[in-house]
Amino acid sequence: MVVKVGINGFGRIGRLAFRRIQNIEGVEVTRINDLTDPNMLAHLLKYDTTQGRFDGTVEVKEGGFEVNGNFIKVSAERDPENIDWATDGVEIVLEATGFFAKKEAAEKHLHANGAKKVVITAPGGNDVKTVVFNTNHDILDGTETVISGASCTTNCLAPMAKALHDAFGIQKGLMTTIHAYTGDQMILDGPHRGGDLRRARAGAANIVPNSTGAAKAIGLVIPELNGKLDGAAQRVPVPTGSVTELVVTLDKNVSVDEINSAMKAASNDSFGYTEDPIVSSDIVGVSYGSLFDATQTKVMEVDGSQLVKVVSWYDNEMSYTAQLVRTLEYFAKIAK
């Protein structure tokens, strides 16, 4: 049985999700909704500065475009309630615009001739289940209509924090994501549409302090860590490839080797482990949601207690997208 998917919003995440779905048997994108001209969408699908050229054929046709010989309808509806997903058999919508990230807004896809399920590609709030695949995807029972795939940083932080907490118990912690610049920053100095004075500065020429909700959102993914973590972000002049540092106090004293052994034991398709001396460009395109770097683990003795620092890499574009697609595929499989 083929699961038919619709993508609302064909930006960075929407296009990369489309790419990944091309390689998954039993999942097919049948409609894309985006306000941008299809010629532009096809061009941006075919050519990608950070992730490389699309490995396939893309040809614009009337009403959409043809990818590897398969026609995908493209519509341009502003209101999700007006998207006729059912005509193309769409069962699950990947909501990737950033504008319909709350449950009530995302549910518009389910109205009229809508779909059956929605996966939001952003933090969704307390009234939807927030899923980081291979960390807490077992909270889903298939009856849900709208779920959130969290954020790219939460997908990096959560498996590392869970492995640390399961093994040693986290008391409190501070995280910092050293994050690639994104499309919500200015390329050159100029007014920021959201009024953020720092994001109004040239993203490719500055380290830009920024907020992140990843640490606080961790409680939606790992309830036992609710209220125990806080953090911030530093946007840096690279187009993709980011890293999360987590500094914590633990319930017990540990060694670097013990921490690294626990992380290696917890590794899986979503949470990788490396002892190589890598840099950010080395993780562009990786499918791990989080790649633990054992070379950066630190333990400091402080008056009989310890401060522990752990570090994990992520491609804020592809790592996150890979996790979203894993979640979508699983959600479709258990749907009731």
From Swiss-Prot:
Residues engaged in binding NAD(+): 12-13, 34, 78, 121, 316
Chief location: cytoplasm
A biological-process GO annotation: glycolytic process
Top-level class of the enzyme under EC nomenclature: oxidoreductase
Record Gene3D superfamilies: Dihydrodipicolinate Reductase, domain 2, NAD(P)-binding Rossmann-like Domain
Keyword NAD: yes
One GO CC term, this protein: cytoplasm
InterPro entries for this protein: GlycerAld/Erythrose_P_DH, GlycerAld_3-P_DH_AS, GlycerAld_3-P_DH_cat, GlycerAld_3-P_DH_NAD(P)-bd, Glyceraldehyde-3-P_DH_1, NAD(P)-bd_dom_sf
Protein's cellular compartments: Cytoplasm
Reactions it catalyzes: D-glyceraldehyde 3-phosphate + phosphate + NAD(+) = (2R)-3-phospho-glyceroyl phosphate + NADH + H(+)
PROSITE patterns reported for this sequence: GAPDH (PS00071)
Residues at the catalytic site: 152 (nucleophile)
EC number(s) given by UniProt: 1.2.1.12
Pathway annotation from the record: Carbohydrate degradation; glycolysis; pyruvate from D-glyceraldehyde 3-phosphate: step 1/5
MF terms (GO), sorted A to Z: glyceraldehyde-3-phosphate dehydrogenase (NAD+) (phosphorylating) activity; NAD binding; NADP binding; protease binding
More about this protein: Binds human plasminogen.
Sequence similarity: Belongs to the glyceraldehyde-3-phosphate dehydrogenase family.
Subunit structure, interactors included: Homotetramer.
PANTHER family: GLYCERALDEHYDE-3-PHOSPHATE DEHYDROGENASE 2
Protein's recorded name: Glyceraldehyde-3-phosphate dehydrogenase
Gene: gap
